């Protein structure tokens, strides 16, 4: 499956620790942000985007991916995890995070080994394909 940039949207954003609510998506401010994120994803779909790339990070990446997975139940969407290297976030124990990665249509690793430059390479990979 080739990635068609004209039909591809990518997500990246803040990690939970940079939001006042942290990982508590039940917080009213978090719920408002998630509704806005879903609205933007729905607009992208209305604009003919069908493939969604996310960087596999906690926070905005994971929340956007979860929304796409929910919408994918009724729409022909593709979700691809673009990880910087194998084992990225292997220490994360949150079930929802692991389930999101596992439910992705594809998982790609940009670099073969862990190194700091892999994070920027992951971001560049997503930008170049969306």
Language-model regions, residue ranges each:
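Acidic/glycine-enriched connector segments
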Residues: 1-130
């Amino acid at each position: 499956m080739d990635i068609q940039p004209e039909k591809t949207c990518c997500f990246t954003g803040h990690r939970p620790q940079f939001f006042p609510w942290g990982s508590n998506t039940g917080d009213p401010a978090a719920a408002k942000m998630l509704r806005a994120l879903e609205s933007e994803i729905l607009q992208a779909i209305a604009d003919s985007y069908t493939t969604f790339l996310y960087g596999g990070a906690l926070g905005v990446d994971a929340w956007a991916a979860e929304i796409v997975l929910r919408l994918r139940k009724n729409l022909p969407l593709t979700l691809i995890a673009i990880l910087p290297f194998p084992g990225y976030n292997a220490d994360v124990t949150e079930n929802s995070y692991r389930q999101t990665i596992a439910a992705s249509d594809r998982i790609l690793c940009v670099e073969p080994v862990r190194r700091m430059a892999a994070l920027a390479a992951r971001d560049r990979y997503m930008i170049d394909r969306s």
